[in-house]
UniProtKB/Swiss-Prot annotation:
Belongs to the class-I aminoacyl-tRNA synthetase family. ValS type 1 subfamily. It holds the Pfam family Val_tRNA-synt_C. The lineage of its organism: Bacteria, Bacillati, Mycoplasmatota, Mollicutes, Entomoplasmatales. It comes from Mesoplasma florum (strain ATCC 33453 / NBRC 100688 / NCTC 11704 / L1) (Acholeplasma florum). SUPFAM superfamilies: Anticodon-binding domain of a subclass of class I aminoacyl-tRNA synthetases, Nucleotidylyl transferase, tRNA-binding arm, ValRS/IleRS/LeuRS editing domain. This is Valine--tRNA ligase.
Length: 873
């Protein structure tokens, strides 16, 4: 077997070509014909707008860790890659690139522009695939999909037609969020609200035929051209005498009625509001109730249309605002401008101020779908959210639902399968293909909201042009888990749920793992403007993929943001280096002809020494907890447990014990077998976190062809070896004592155990002394009467003491005991706070709660012993 690792860990050597080797050997290829249980993850498709960022790296690392964990646990896994055409985002990028060449999309025309968009897609898709490979994501590339693939387009069209025929999709005039820069409607979630300094402008609306006026305030004077009425509350005694009269709009001198509606709040502003139905959602609803006209005073680009007359027509909306103020000031109908801070909506893509705008759009009726989701989440078949609180976020969205605007005035996307009759535009044909007399019809120019096609992602990707007959659809739906951010629960998660159920009758996924944002080390959100963004590829070039993955995963708690820092990546590298050096030591202590025992031989062996039994027992405990935690997606806690076991239990202690046992012919073979058996299983359990280095080290063990052919550790070793944990604490305490007091190792120290729980010390006194003799040149007696003054050390739940000789400094000892007492009091206070915290008790893993309770009791015992010692001194 004799193989060796390189003297130094080099991530460049370890990671080079490994991913290609996995792909070539089809380790990630799904097999729908396999009898193994199935588990699938469909990658949330990154946009082809650019390269992957650190958030993608975190998201992908989480999914990949789950996939590898499931594969090692005997599942046939499918990790399906794909990319999103990202309608408006990509179109913005392509248009910007064309503008640099002095070309507009309208000059190019639709077909030529789409050619440019596809070129962009192919360029960035290649970059993204390269980034995936660097991250080591376990994709089945034979299943890769793009949201504009022909087979996806066919399913999108089918569902649009199906929903339309069921009355779930309709076309109508509604107020939408309008991006005047991109000249398209955008969804609510694509609107970013920012606090902006602005003004509340007050105007006189004169009462027709009188010298009286009403003070009307607005933040958007440019919409006054389309005012249809003034509105007051019918209960507002200040204005009841004006109801039914007419007021003169100061911007165009048109007379408009004064009406009453309960919508107006008595104590807000002046109590009089102008109603502009085509430019405000609430005004639109008032207009519907009162049967008002809904004229539009702006063009699609945000300029004023013919309603502004010669003076204002063609002006940008904000230029028009300033001119209105200027003119009405002269006419003495402008009262004042009150400074204010208010929330203004900006387009996420173009950063233009969004205009509420009445427009002909296609909509999905959402009431029945919202009810569907609410009923599902109250049933036994509900989709599980991790953390559970995000289930309530989904429900809240569904309880406050509005119809979904699905049409976009773009060219890049799924074109709406609707045709209008040339002779009679009110005649609409919706179908899979154009009507037979296509020459008499014109297809809708608009495309579908990107989220419409993305909402089909969990199942459309599995159909492979075969529809419901696809083996992949039958075997891998529902997906095992969706991993995504909390910011798209409404825009994506909810839509996948209702679209999948409506079309397939199945839920899209069983679990939803929610994560937050990647922030910088100070907690600030990463952004280009702050200059604190991180390119994951730069991190990989400097530290390796495993270091990046480990730092992300071991700081990943469901539902929480993560703070990225270079120091965390460096700490991950140090851990890998520790694992590397430990593995080198193991390999260097094996003979050329070493053959590992079968697992059953380890289980049944009578030749294991006490430290072999101890480390196997400790590993069993850790593996059991790690399994539980990863099943709950608690990668941070599970990773910390593995880190502690590898660094402390295996490397710091077991290998130290093994150095003695490997030099003893009686214990050598069993120790060799144990140390290799453990190394193999450590590598397997670390593989989801560190795929590259674990595969590299595993291959030096000369076992199976790949670590991916191995099985997750599921054995249980239970030996009575708890006393070795006592030995470790004793060795640590005595070593620290020697160092503090400058006592050389060749000086024999005779200790006496006293004051506390001495049951284990008594039962295993001989074994404990063997270890103490070997490792710290010390003896330990029990409850001996010592005549002279002694120095005491607190160890777990008992004390050890030694007679005071010349090397003892009593004042220093008192100081150390006082310091220890303070530390314990702080720990007891912390523990009490945790155990009385309802959130901790309700959300933490039972093992974590039990661990905290045990710590609490131990701290109290230690404090009691120290206090007793201080009292005696």
């Amino acid at each position: 077997m004799k193989k060796e690792l390189e003297a130094k860990y080099s991530y460049e050597i370890v990671e080079e070509n490994r991913y290609e080797w996995w792909i070539q050997n089809e380790y990630f290829k799904a097999n729908p014909d396999s009898k193994k249980p199935k588990f699938s993850i469909v990658l949330p498709p990154p946009n082809v707008t650019g390269k992957l960022h650190i958030g993608h790296a975190w998201d992908g690392s989480l999914q990949d860790a789950i996939i590898r964990f499931k594969k090692l646990n005997g599942f046939d896994v499918l990790y399906l890659p794909g990319m999103d055409h990202a309608g408006i985002s990509t179109q913005v990028k392509v248009e910007a690139k064309l503008r640099e060449q002095g070309i507009s999309r309208f000059e190019l025309g639709r077909e030529k522009f789409l050619e440019q968009a596809w070129k962009w897609k192919h360029e960035y898709a290649a970059i993204i695939r390269q980034q995936w490979s660097k991250l080591g994501l376990a994709f089945d590339y034979s299943m890769e999909k793009f949201t504009l693939d022909d087979d996806i387009n066919k399913i999108v069209t089918e569902i649009f037609v199906d929903f339309y025929n069921k009355g779930l999709i309709y076309k109508g005039k509604r107020i939408v969020n309008w991006d005047p820069m991109q000249k398209t409607a955008i969804s609510n979630v694509e609107v970013i609200y920012k606090e902006v300094e602005g003004f509340m402008y007050h105007f006189k609306y004169m009462i027709q035929g009188t010298n009286e006026f009403l003070n009307v305030a607005t933040t958007r004077p440019e919409t006054m051209f389309a005012d249809q009425c003034l509105v007051v509350n019918p209960k507002d005694e200040r204005y009841t005498s004006f109801i039914g009269k007419k007021a003169i709009n100061p911007v165009n001198n048109q007379a408009i009625p004064i009406i009453a509606d309960d919508y107006v709040e008595l104590d807000f502003g002046t109590g009089v509001m102008k109603c502009t139905p085509a430019h405000d959602l609430n005004d639109f609803e008032i207009a519907v109730r009162h049967n008002l006209e809904k004229p539009i005073c702006m063009n699609e680009d945000g300029t004023i249309n013919e309603m502004g007359g010669e003076e204002y027509q063609g002006l940008d909306r904000f230029e028009a605002r300033n001119k209105i103020i200027e003119n009405l000031t002269k006419e003495k109908t402008f009262i004042k401008a009150e400074p204010m801070i208010h929330q203004v909506g900006f387009s996420e893509r173009s950063n233009a101020i969004v205009e509420p705008y009445l427009s002909d759009q296609w909509f999905v009726k959402m009431d029945s779908f919202a009810d569907m989701i609410l009923k599902l989440q109250e049933s036994n078949d509900k989709i599980k959210f991790f953390p559970e609180r995000f289930d309530q976020v989904l429900k809240k969205w569904m309880e406050n639902i509005h119809d979904w605007t699905i049409s976009r005035q773009l060219w890049w996307g799924h074109r709406i399968p609707a045709w209008y009759n040339k002779e009679d535009k009110t005649k609409i044909y919706v179908g899979m293909e154009a009507p037979k007399d296509a020459e008499n019809w014109i297809q809708d120019e608009d495309v579908l909201d990107t989220w419409f096609s993305s909402g089909l992602w969990p199942f459309a990707t599995l159909m492979r042009g075969e529809g419901f007959e696809s083996k992949y659809f039958k075997e891998y739906l529902p997906n095992g888990v969706l991993v995504t951010g909390h910011d798209i629960i409404f825009s994506w998660v909810s839509r996948m749920i209702f679209q999948t159920i409506e079309y397939t009758g199945q839920i899209p996924f069983k679990d939803v793992l929610i994560h937050g944002l990647v922030r910088d080390e100070h907690g600030a959100k990463m952004s280009k403007s702050l200059g604190n963004g991180i390119d994951p590829m730069d991190v990989i070039v400097n530290n390796g993929s495993d270091s990046l993955r480990f730092s992300l995963l071991t700081n990943s708690t469901p539902g929480q943001d993560i703070r990225y820092s270079d120091s965390k990546v460096k700490a991950a590298w140090n851990f890998i280096n520790k694992l590397w050096n430990a593995s080198r030591y193991v390999l260097m202590n094996l003979e050329e002809d070493f053959k590992p025992w079968e697992e059953q031989a380890i289980l049944n062996s009578n030749s294991l020494n006490e430290t072999d039994k101890w480390v196997l027992t400790e590993f069993s405990k850790v593996s059991k907890q790690v399994n539980y935690l990863i099943d709950k997606y608690e990668f941070a806690i599970a990773g910390k447990m593995l880190y502690d076991f590898v660094w402390n239990t295996y490397c710091s202690w077991y290998i130290e014990f093994a150095k003695v046992n490997l030099n003893n012919p009686k214990t050598k073979e069993a120790t060799q077998q144990t140390i290799v058996y453990l190394l193999k299983n450590i590598l397997i359990m670390l593989h989801p976190y560190l795929p590259f280095v674990t595969e590299h080290i595993y291959k030096t063990l000369d076992m199976k062809n790949s670590i991916l052919e191995e099985s997750w550790f599921d054995k249980e070793f239970v030996f009575e070896t708890d006393y070795i944990n006592v030995v470790i604490e004793l060795i640590n305490s005595i070593r620290e004592f020697r160092a503090t007091n400058n006592i050389k190792n060749n000086v024999l120290l005779n200790w006496n155990a006293t004051n506390g729980n001495l049951e284990i010390i008594t039962k295993y006194n001989l074994e404990i002394n063997n270890f103490l003799n070997e490792f710290v040149n010390a003896n330990l007696s029990i409850n001996e009467s010592l005549v002279s003054e002694t120095t005491s050390l607190s160890v777990l739940d008992f004390f050890i003491e030694i007679p005071n000789d010349d090397f003892i400094d009593k004042e220093k000892m008192l100081e150390e005991l006082a310091t220890k007492k303070k530390e314990l009091e702080n720990e007891i206070s912390r523990s009490e706070r945790m155990l009385s915290n309802e959130n901790f008790i309700s959300k933490a893993a039972p093992s974590k709660i039990e661990e905290e309770k045990e710590k609490y009791e131990l701290y109290k015992q230690q404090l009691e012993l120290i206090q007793d010692k201080l009292n005696k001194m």
